[in-house]
């Protein structure tokens, strides 16, 4: 029998080269993005800054592992450790929201919503969600979205007098159109939602109630916003935004039978192998959200957004609905004659990042808009308090006032504000070891 010689393995640079060594172009772009996040004030309400631990989990070798199926029921071998990670994510999610069921595999909030639709509806069924211009989301029945193409999408809005949901109008609409599914929640509604009232309406017309709490999930987990779980048949959410985890989605329910349908809808219905490195990041973020300091964080998120709103109001600008109960606020620029797109650009030149956004009954196109959406999660994560958010509001007013006077923007004012922003952000560094 011949001797089998096994040569010593070569130490491959494939496993040792850094991204700077192997791909300078991508490394440079990442470096510049880190600098942008450090030097600019992030006010986009759907963005946040994750912990170093979440970054490490998401950049781990779990990205190598295929794991179609669910813990204990995989279609591949070698899943014992990713099973541990996914089970941790599931159990922590259930504990955070008081849920009996959780699916942490959706790759996004949109796919979580699609999973619910696939489980509960058939093409042509009627859904009732908040209209996009009133603060809803694309996936709640907007015409360009799958939800507006595959289903008969009806919508409810807000009162013109105070920009709040009119529950009597929602009830009347539900009775009129008889939806199979009612969707509560949105992407630009700053006030608390009465989930108990939505459930009453759903029961009256025999509809399922789905709550999309993508924007407020962290506030719910921290106890500063009403929990929809006791009222909804199903809740969907993203895992970033106020929950401060990696970008991804999740489905929650207290109905185990519906849970089986949601599992089948996500896999094999919509997705194949889950992103295990992202699920690891979710597990870490959920663990962070279970700590006592997370409640303090979300309490500050709300207080900071209210301080920002007050500073903007004191500067002569209108806040939709007169204020906020959450992490976001909408600035109505119509009284000043400004458009959302030009305001967004002027503020970004001053290193304040937010987004143009439609306001209720907005006459402008979605690419133009009459408003700005601002939010407090990211800057609160880096340590800003009420004093800093008040200053940020004052700086915003200064840039916007200059834009009223000079429609192309005032370069001198923007430069002065930019230097003030850089001085402020320098006091609150992020990822210093990555800079």
From Swiss-Prot:
One of its GO terms (cellular component) is cytosol. Its cofactor is pyridoxal 5'-phosphate. It is an enzyme of class 2 (transferase). The keyword Amino-acid biosynthesis applies. Its EC number is 2.1.2.1. The modification N6-(pyridoxal phosphate)lysine is found at residue 241. Pathway: One-carbon metabolism; tetrahydrofolate interconversion; Amino-acid biosynthesis; glycine biosynthesis; glycine from L-serine: step 1/1. It holds the Pfam family SHMT. The record marks 240 as: Plays an important role in substrate specificity. GO terms for biological process: glycine biosynthetic process from serine; tetrahydrofolate interconversion. SUPFAM superfamilies: PLP-dependent transferases. GO terms for molecular function: glycine hydroxymethyltransferase activity; pyridoxal phosphate binding. (6S)-5,6,7,8-tetrahydrofolate binds at residues 132, 136-138. Belongs to the SHMT family. Catalyzes the reversible interconversion of serine and glycine with tetrahydrofolate (THF) serving as the one-carbon carrier. This reaction serves as the major source of one-carbon groups required for the biosynthesis of purines, thymidylate, methionine, and other important biomolecules. Also exhibits THF-independent aldolase activity toward beta-hydroxyamino acids, producing glycine and aldehydes, via a retro-aldol mechanism. Homodimer. This is Serine hydroxymethyltransferase. It comes from Maricaulis maris (strain MCS10). The gene is glyA.
